[in-house]
């Protein structure tokens, strides 16, 4: 056992109390101005103050876990009911357009039709299982190889397509014959609703899709993703939207639009109105038409929900087409950026884009939509006058060293300009860091919760602890860091067969990771990362922004 680990064993990991409120009060004591990004009196540090505890489970004006879940389910049910009205009666005619809606819809259909031309031979090319737990399976059975190896679930309408893609894969057929798996996949009625944490007021509702539905849906999603990239919309790269948001915060040329519950706003009528008929018919067959909510079966008026394998790509394509059609109609050739419901368009036409979105049943989140001023937010990036002012959140009680070290690193990394941390937070950092033993200081990873980033000593050696964490020994330097991942053993022959089919689906490439060496060593380059510094650590403090 190393000396570092022995020292760790002698430490008290738990703190005497939750420091969350104390941290909030310390930041609030130095914050001035308004935390509302729409206000002329906006300041970044007030924004941090106002956002800090909004995801804390017990502090602030939040709800308990059961209430958060209940509200999320109720919100999903309401959205489903609203889409039912659109499906029966048409789009919201009280949301009139300042130009002919038929012209807009014709343009949208044309854009999407051209984008997706030649789709018939492209929908099955990248079908795959996800790593998530599908309907009818537990999380421990969520790995793709297990879905290939076991009897997969599917809805009745998707069964024919599922059999077609399975019968085109020789290893899959051999597996089914060898292990006497039924050629008729296990039928289920639809998807299942669950919730995940969002903030301290409400959870986020999503759905677990049946195995083969998800497999087919992801093929459609991959196809749309490829086609969108051909028109400059790269759904594999959030940084594009983030850079555009930064540009908009500097010169005001670009607006950022955020929609409220966009994934739960896509009606059946909307997709039917926009997509080529044959493609709509295929997507309609492989989606879930019914969902299980707390044991109750409901019919989905929504075309797809969060958790569906093509929802993200489908909504991105729809928003791209709406923005592009609006651009064309008003003769605007400015830059646009789309990443799901994170929409960026020229500020000049943003009011028209919002008008078109409202016509088709989408509601902007006005708190997070920025058309004027010098604040912009997109894809998790928050910019004010070109400076990253994204707040960090205390999502759980700060009642142990690991939680405290993470907050200390967040304090150092927040609002960095020119390599300098915000000087107003220095005293807060010093006071809180005094509760952390000196052996935990050093390192460069501001996302770490197992040491406190502090100049100038870089962490060099990692040691495993009984708690599964990696501790830094700062007494030595010059070694490269490595993460050790031990291979799992004792896979059954049946599961090995499933793993082979999964490997076959990825192209059958032979890589080093195919070798069974027992362990894998992954080198990192953390020692090259610069450390943000408080001005007080290197001379007289600079003036606050």
Curated annotation (Swiss-Prot):
Broad EC category:
transferase
Q: Name one GO molecular function term.
A: RNA-directed RNA polymerase activity
Query: Which residue numbers delimit the RdRp catalytic domain?
Result: 243-373
Q: Keywords assigned by UniProt?
A: Nucleotide-binding, Nucleotidyltransferase, RNA-directed RNA polymerase, Transferase, Viral RNA replication
- Please indicate which superkingdom the organism of origin belongs to: Viruses
Q: Which GO terms describe its biological process?
A: viral RNA genome replication
Q: Which organism is it from?
A: Escherichia phage MS2 (Bacteriophage MS2)
* Subunit structure and binding partners: Part of the viral RNA-dependent RNA polymerase complex, the other subunits are probably the host ribosomal protein S1, EF-Tu and EF-Ts.
- General function of this protein: This is the catalytic subunit of the viral RNA-dependent RNA polymerase complex. This complex is involved in viral RNA replication that produces (+)-stranded genomes via a complementary, (-)-stranded intermediate.
Catalytic activity, as annotated: RNA(n) + a ribonucleoside 5'-triphosphate = RNA(n+1) + diphosphate
Q: What is this protein called?
A: RNA-directed RNA polymerase beta chain
InterPro entries found in the cross-reference section: DNA/RNA_pol_sf, RNA-dir_Rpol_cat_phage, RNArep_beta
Q: E.C. number, please?
A: 2.7.7.48
Return the Pfam families for the record: RNA_replicase_B
Taxonomic lineage of the native organism = Viruses, Riboviria, Orthornavirae, Lenarviricota, Leviviricetes
